[in-house]
Amino acid sequence: MQHMTTAQIRQQFLDFFASKQHQVVPSSSLIPGNDATLLFNNAGMVQFKDVFLGAESRPYTRATSSQRCVRAGGKHNDLENVGYTARHHTFFEMLGNFSFGDYFKQDAIKFAWQFLTEEVKLPKEKLLVTIYHDDEEAFNYWSNDIGLPADRIIRIATADNFWSMGDTGPCGPCSEIFYDHGEHIWGGPPGSPEEDGDRFIEIWNLVFMQYNRQNDGTMLPLPKQSVDTGMGLERIAAILQGVHSNYEIDLFKGLIAAAASVTNAQDMDDKSLRVVADHIRSCAFLISDGVMPSNEGRGYVLRRIIRRAVRHGNKLGAQGAFFYKLVAALIEQMGQAYPELAKQQEIIEKVLRIEEEQFGKTLERGLAILEESLSDLKGDVIPGDLVFKLYDTYGFPADLTADVARERQMTIDNKGFEECMAVQRKTAQQAGKFGADYNDQLKSDKQTTYKGYTTTSHSATVVEVFAGSESVSLLEDGQKGIVILDRTPFYAESGGQVGDTGVISVAGGEFTVTNTTKLGNAFAHHGIVQGRIGLNDKVEATIDDARRERIKKNHTATHILHETLRQLLGEHVGQKGSLVQAERLRFDFSHFEAVTKEELREIERVVNDEIRCNFALSTELMAIDDAKAKGAMALFGEKYDDEVRVVTIGDYSIELCGGTHVERAGDIGLFKIVSESGIAAGVRRIEAVTGADAIAYVSEQEQKLNDVAAVVKADSASVLEKVTALLDKSKQLEKQIAQLNDKLASAAGASLLDSVVEINGIKLLIANVKGTESKALRGMVDDLKNKIGSGVIALGVASDDKVSLIAGVTKDLTGRVKAGELVNHMASQVGGKGGGRPDMAQAGGSEPENLTAALDSVTAWFTEKTQA
């Protein structure tokens, strides 16, 4: 058996199949571009799915690859097992060879056996195989061509040895190759009662696609039989390096050593080191492929993996952010095979560090809540509502809580957690419901030809009319409705661009268009009629050209902004949404932190530089594949027709877009950013104005500056210096006022000492401190605690319509009286609630008329509480 590094195995596999006339195909992205049903690329065949289905052709019929895969979230989820078993990973590499109607079973079996026994020299006696129980072809090839004894060819009748792409479509039997680790490890061969043991490990699966399953379950032979194989790189590396666990191979040894270093871990066998070492691989590659941490979809899976790693690092003893420091170690191990890691190192590290720091703020508090709850828990199941509270309040994914439970030999109530989640989702859906849209109620089978790219006015014929949700033949004076034309210059709302407005002129009337939307293949012109308009009328449709020009400026500026963000912030930036109006543009994009003022200034400068370059815009219709080959940016997850419209701005920007644009970039005039904000986890929003609107905005800001200068008696050049000086003076005066209030409160407090009473051997002071600022209450309580030495204090004050309450307990008495309980007793009587530490707690209320009664009730409450 030949000892090889992981990198050597990967290369030798690809070289071997290249020598067998296979095209070496690079790993595709972890984000499947051709399968919306998959969260992540989880097998080598995913990038070839359309080839297998006959929907795509390639210039080769044989291929080989080493495919990056992630299994975490969705149907294929290994997350909870990672670190606790020898072979579960969130990220792994799948070595594979594929035949698209070329060779079939005989050569697939021959190639696999040749690679294992001749190339990497595995002992033949250590190998055995499984076949589907009635696959006589495979049996004969293994027996006659390879020479395997019949007792090492195991027939399996279950679905484990029959693969299918779905309920219908391509399918076929499998043949799996197993390696025997030896009698010293417990376990039996596949198909035996002991098959779940670790002695016999599957290393390679050969799938023979030979049938097409019909809706009725019958299976017809495929016209072109194909082969799909997959071998886990980490598994074969463990065998060739003479170790039993994947975590002992060269690649993981380096990552585990780095993880131990950054977490100060002492025990190199700690399972948490495995978790951290595994998770840095999936997290780094996901970020490299454009996934950002968020609260939904792929981004949430990434967030869960990061948070699980951070929790395990915390468990190992890590102080502060540590996870991002492992990126360098990962690049050292895998950067040669995947140079994109090194290229994006800075971005990957930054995303991980920010996410870790944000979670670190709640991790300690959440763990404390969990520990406290577990100490009071009866039984070995963590309630679903607690799991939900940790998720909702502290950002603990349920699988992180399950991880903690597993370490305590406990489980979580998944059903209860899902019920809580269902309630939350229902509430969110109800909150998000708005009035029904016209278009939700209407259907049209008409087709409108769009003429608006080249003209602002066009003759047309009315082909359909709606009044409300009813199809009618006529709209009469003052009536609102929808008019559908056979041709129109009006752009229908889509791709983030608002619909056009304008007029549709007809003999005997005029239809004022207030919006244009799509209704299937028809364009729906919404508006109100003066006079009349009806079916088959000949009309002239004219858009509001001035408004359209403003929209065009904003749409083209959006394209320039998008490219600028990618150049300045990083290629991880992707469009998450946009709104192109006449008044302004709004652009939502993926980014992991707020854009700084300096970055915004640079973004604005670059966009305006590109505008001044005055590049000509060109549009072209082309095949979607040709557009992507030219580098046209497409929105991920969007469905495009086979033919798409490509908008190019000089040599700066190229995007798929159906919207309207200026003829040259210089037509935009000026671009000015109005605001930048966060709208969701990992999503930022920039709003901006262009052209005359930008000039008006700058003029307005200049006027505001002049107004401020006039107020502070300065000119515009020195206004900042003058305002800064005034703020400094204001802070000094506020500090002096606070000091005076503290002195007044202390003096008032001293006079309260005469009100101290002793109940059950404990001093108690209750007072309504009229006229005292609520901000001064805490200082007053501290001062009183020092003066009385040992005791309990309850103070209240009413101002306007509010009540402020505070309770203080000296440290020696917190075992008998809790400040939080006392302040909440009072707060419940004045329409409020509060909280704090055992020795100091505050509350507010909205019923000042009940303050006296609340304070009067303290004596009885305290007497009962302190009885021995």
Swiss-Prot record:
Cofactor: Zn(2+)
Keywords: Aminoacyl-tRNA synthetase, ATP-binding, Cytoplasm, Ligase, Metal-binding, Nucleotide-binding, Protein biosynthesis, RNA-binding, tRNA-binding, Zinc
Domain of life: Bacteria
Positions of the UniProt region annotated as Disordered: 828-847
EC number of the protein: 6.1.1.7
Cofactor binding: number and manner: Binds 1 zinc ion per subunit.
A GO term for molecular function: zinc ion binding
Sequence positions that bind Zn(2+): 555, 559, 657, 661
Family matches, as InterPro entries: aa-tRNA-synth_II/BPL/LPL (IPR045864), Ala-tRNA-lgiase_IIc (IPR002318), Ala-tRNA-ligase_IIc_anticod-bd (IPR018162), Ala-tRNA-synth_IIc_core (IPR018165), Ala-tRNA-synth_IIc_N (IPR018164), Ala-tRNA_ligase (IPR050058), Ala_tRNA_ligase_euk/bac (IPR023033), DHHA1_dom (IPR003156)
Reaction it catalyzes: tRNA(Ala) + L-alanine + ATP = L-alanyl-tRNA(Ala) + AMP + diphosphate
Record-linked PROSITE patterns: AA_TRNA_LIGASE_II_ALA
Record carries keyword Lipid biosynthesis: no
GO cellular component: cytosol
Top EC group: ligase
Any single biological process term in GO: negative regulation of DNA-templated transcription
Subcellular location: Cytoplasm
Protein role: Catalyzes the attachment of alanine to tRNA(Ala) in a two-step reaction: alanine is first activated by ATP to form Ala-AMP and then transferred to the acceptor end of tRNA(Ala). Also edits incorrectly charged Ser-tRNA(Ala) and Gly-tRNA(Ala) via its editing domain.
Domain text: Consists of three domains; the N-terminal catalytic domain, the editing domain and the C-terminal C-Ala domain. The editing domain removes incorrectly charged amino acids, while the C-Ala domain, along with tRNA(Ala), serves as a bridge to cooperatively bring together the editing and aminoacylation centers thus stimulating deacylation of misacylated tRNAs.
Stated family: Belongs to the class-II aminoacyl-tRNA synthetase family.
Record protein name field: Alanine--tRNA ligase
Organism: Pseudoalteromonas translucida (strain TAC 125)
